[in-house]
Amino acid sequence: MSEADPLFGSATKPGWTHGPIFDADVHIDPPHDMWKEYLPESQRAKAPVIEHGEDCDYICFEGNRRPVMMINNQAGRAGKDFKMKGRVSEQRNTYDPAKRLADMDLDGIDQAICFGGGPLGSFDNDLYIASFEGYSRWVMDWASNAPHRLFPVGHAPMRDIDETISHVKRLAKMGFRMVQLPAFPQNPEAWKTSSEIKNMKSGQVAAQTGDPQGALQYYQPEFDKLWKVLCDEGIVITF
């Protein structure tokens, strides 16, 4: 989260006559350790964990160990303090609602659509699907600190149309007003062999890109029932 520029002032200052200022694309990254609390109990043992190394902190997940990256926490730092990796405690947490709202006030932003986070890029099908529910619960709890100002975007998988419809209905009941779908429908076969899983994981961005060469594509009439549910629920979609 960037340091706010206080020169912009407040959108609610006297004399402002153009209505609320709405930021249509802010980003929120959940804390790395939130999965242990928000995944279904049956999946929590598989959640990512933070390991404190001598040089930096590491995120350990499914046999991989990667450093905590600081690249999105450089705004406002002096050049001499620039660093690519570091510790969780050094990050300016985008998930702190008080800091988020204070920055919005300084920038004159009244309300915001909040993208980011989403499911785990997992090799495990059950964990992958469960992470959609876990993220939805976390981000809605986070937004509940200012529900009139923070509007989180939900996530839904797109491997099977009926499966997606069930996720959309669940998100609507939770209060989401916008849902992000993968850019292309996903290949449901990708979870069945180790080679396909490897291709799926390396080719997806946050498990949300999909398969542009797949047999199922959004323009096909099979998707009409999904579009109808989205309209009936008053849900806006984004890709």
Regions found by a protein language model. Give the residues of each.
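Helix-coil boundary/capping segments in enzymes
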Residues: 1-239
